[in-house]
Regions:
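Beta-rich, blade/repeat-based domains predominating
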Residues: 46-51, 89-108, 142-157, 196-214, ...
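Residue position within the beta-strands of beta-propeller blades
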Residues: 58, 114, 160, 217-218, ...
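Short loop/turn segments immediately following the C-termini of beta-strands
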Residues: 61-63, 73, 117-118, 127, ...
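Structural motif
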Residues: 65-69, 121-123, 168-177, 224-230, ...
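Short loop/turn segments immediately following beta-strands, especially the blade-tip
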Residues: 71-79, 125-133, 178-187, 231-241, ...
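Beta-propeller fold detector
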Residues: 79-90, 133-142, 187-196, 240-248, ...
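Asp-box/WD-like beta-propeller blade repeats and closely related beta-sheet repeat scaffolds
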Residues: 133-207
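Blade-level signature of beta-propeller repeat domains, shared across WD40, Kelch, NHL, RCC1
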Residues: 370-410
Length: 410
């Protein structure tokens, strides 16, 4: 009897322990499965079947209700205006057909910044789903001057170039003003950041170097004022300090408008509409000191005004306003330029070709047709030359506005 009772107790204990052992085994098995799943997620290749859509932005420059035009870009380069576009900037555009600027609109993370030249302000809009944009609280913000036409942004610093006058009509002293940008997109002026330029020689473009250490500004294209290239060192408080050799007058050409930084931030390639040429400048990354490298590189076209550079820095594209064309240069050792050829825009009303940008994947180039309020699309070939997409796909008409201004690719 005693042995049967002891066996019964032992059997009961074994049965009672089985769920515990089973649960422990299940827990260890589940842990192993979880670890495998985590590793799989970490090593999983990105989904390329549904790539994140990219967008292109320009400004319709509407005189009563300025707006940012958003166009969705597909992998084959085709673009189509986003539903609800244009998105109001809360300001006004500027009259006059020949608005010389580069950098009127910029993409910075989740924000799009755009100038309101007709109401002296800068709009900051936040990206929404489907390519839509919405103004941040407080936008638009005063630009700190008259007729803002170019801006640049790096991290939390923004600089705005106020040109102060329409073509040939000086009104007040043009300037450059700095702002701090907070995480919500609000702009606050930086005390002591204002830098004034001579009357009639307002800035055409302002842009941080790729690393944000220096800022270059082109100016002096209005009337017969001598052109100037300004180089500034960015100080710890966000203000700018003019560097050695600045300002510098380009040799061999004049009428500076747009420019592009080299990816390394040690050179700038500057367009000059008088003589339709490019001048190259070396910029010391530590001090911001600037000097011209070589002479002027002509493209045998009319009014070279806007530029774009490939991500690898090997190819420079130049938009010729009067010729309605885009010239292509090889960028060699030391910044030496060699012309590769020129592509004419299809059936544009001359003069019309303005801002240009290269897509992030390097496969397409986009060009603003300002007077006809349209954007042209070009495929970039293996030889780096441009071929405009077929009629019906290029150019793409903008729905509203006049004298379309600026171009930014997300």
């Amino acid at each position: 009897m005693f042995y049967r009772l002891r066996f019964a107790v032992f059997f009961f204990l074994v049965l009672a322990a089985q769920p515990i052992i089973s649960q422990g085994a299940q827990s260890r098995g589940a842990a192993r499965q979880t670890n495998k799943a985590q590793v799989a997620r970490m090593t999983r290749r990105p989904d390329t079947t549904h790539p994140t859509p990219s967008y292109i932005y320009t400004i319709n420059n509407d005189l009563a209700n300025n707006g940012v035009v958003a166009l969705k870009r597909s992998a084959d380069g085709l673009i189509a205006e986003v539903l609800g576009s244009p998105f109001s900037t809360g300001g006004k555009g500027l009259s006059g057909g020949d608005i010389d600027e580069q950098g009127a609109i910029r993409v910075h993370g989740e924000f799009v910044l755009a100038v309101n030249p007709g109401s002296n302000s800068v709009a900051v809009l936040r990206k929404q789903s489907g390519g839509k944009l919405m103004a941040v609280p407080g936008s638009p913000f005063p630009s700190g001057g008259s007729h803002p036409l170019s801006l640049t942004v790096h991290k939390n610093l923004v600089y705005v170039a106020n040109q102060a006058a329409e073509w040939g009509n000086p009104a007040s002293a043009p300037n450059l003003v700095g702002f701090h940008m907070d995480s919500d997109g609000r702009l606050t002026p930086i005390p002591g950041s204002r830098i004034e330029f001579p009357r009639g020689a307002g800035p055409a473009q302002v842009e941080f170097s790729p690393t944000g250490e220096n800022v270059v500004v082109t100016s002096g294209f209005q009337g017969e004022n001598a052109s100037r290239i300004h180089s500034f060192r960015v100080m710890s408080d966000g203000r700018l300090h003019e560097a050695a050799g600045s300002p510098l007058a380009p040799q061999g050409a004049s009428g500076t408008v747009g420019f592009s930084w080299s990816p390394m931030g040690d050179r700038v390639y500057v367009s000059n509409f008088r003589g339709s040429a490019i001048t190259v400048f070396s910029v010391d990354r530590q001090s911001g000191g600037i000097r011209q490298v070589g002479g002027a590189y002509g493209d045998n076209e009319q009014a070279a005004c806007w530029t774009a550079i490939s991500a690898d820095g090997r190819t420079l594209y130049v938009a010729n306003f009067v010729s309605n064309s885009i010239s292509v240069f090889d960028v060699g050792t030391g910044g030496k330029l060699t012309p590769l050829g020129t592509t004419k825009r299809r059936a544009g009303t001359s003069p019309d070709t303005k801002d240009i940008e290269v897509s992030k994947d390097g496969k397409h180039l986009y060009a603003v047709g300002s007077g006809k309020t349209e954007v042209a699309v070009f495929q970039i070939g293996a030889d780096r030359m441009l071929t405009e997409l077929s009629a019906g796909h290029s150019p793409v008409k903008i729905s509203t506005g006049q004298n379309t201004t600026g171009l930014a690719v997300d």
